[in-house]
Amino acid sequence: MALEAQMTLRMFVLVAMASTVHVLSSSFSEDLGTVPLSKVFRSETRFTLIQSLRALLSRQLEAEVHQPEIGHPGFSDETSSRTGKRGGLGRCIHNCMNSRGGLNFIQCKTMCS
C-alpha cells in the first residue's frame, strides 16, 4: 500500500513538473531563427518522463512478483493444519479472500482444506 502511495505521489510530481515546464517555456518570447525553447523542453521532459515511468513500472512489477499467489504455501498455516485446529483454516480463508486474486469464500475454502 505504501509503495502504491509513493508511486502515485511520484507520478503526480512528474506530471506537475512537466506541466510547469511546458507553461514556462511557452510563456517566454522566442527570437526568430533560433530553435524554439518549448521544443527543447518538450524533448527533455519527454525523455525524463519516459525514464521515470519505466523505473516506476519496473518497481511495481518487481513488487508484484514478490507477493504470494493463490495456492502458495504461505497462505495456509501448516502448524494449525497438522493439529486440526479450525483457526488455521479460518486464517487461510481470510488471507485468500483478502488477496488480490478476488476469490470467493467457497473457492478459498476448497483451496485451504
Curated annotation (Swiss-Prot):
GO cellular component labels: extracellular region
Post-translational events: Contains 2 disulfide bonds.
Presence of keyword Secreted: yes
Main location per the UniProt record: secreted
Tissue spec. comment: Expressed by the venom duct.
UniProt keyword annotations, A-Z: Cleavage on pair of basic residues, Disulfide bond, Secreted, Signal, Toxin
Residues of the signal peptide: 1-21
Note: Is 88% identical to As14a (AC P0C6S2).
UniProt remark on domains: The cysteine framework is XIV (C-C-C-C).
Family the UniProt entry places it in: Belongs to the teretoxin N (TN) superfamily.
The name this protein goes by in its record: Teretoxin Tan14.1
